[in-house]
Amino acid sequence: MARKCYITGRQAKSGNKRSHAMNKTKRRWGANVQKVRILVDGKPKRVYVSARALKSGKVERV
């Protein structure tokens, strides 16, 4: 299972890390996703959900 939000689709983004000399190195910013149990089609399922979706009430924990 990918570390991607089941509700909003948020996932890791990529970009460059820049040193003081402005050298660039590829890096990734991970999304704040938590593994939680939610109801999917009336059955509990353990999925990754972003913290933003949890805080906004888009999903109900079981």
From Swiss-Prot:
Cross-referenced Gene3D superfamilies: Ribosomal protein L28/L24 (2.30.170.40)
The UniProt GO MF terms for this protein read: structural constituent of ribosome
In terms of SUPFAM superfamilies, this protein maps to:
L28p-like
Give a yes or no for keyword Amino-acid biosynthesis in this entry: no
Which UniProt key words apply to this protein? Ribonucleoprotein, Ribosomal protein
Name a Pfam family for this protein: Ribosomal_L28
- Keyword Oxidoreductase: yes or no? no
> Mind listing the GO biological process terms from this record?
translation
What's the family? Answer: Belongs to the bacterial ribosomal protein bL28 family.
List the protein's name: Large ribosomal subunit protein bL28
Q: Which organism is it from?
A: Halalkalibacterium halodurans (strain ATCC BAA-125 / DSM 18197 / FERM 7344 / JCM 9153 / C-125) (Bacillus halodurans)
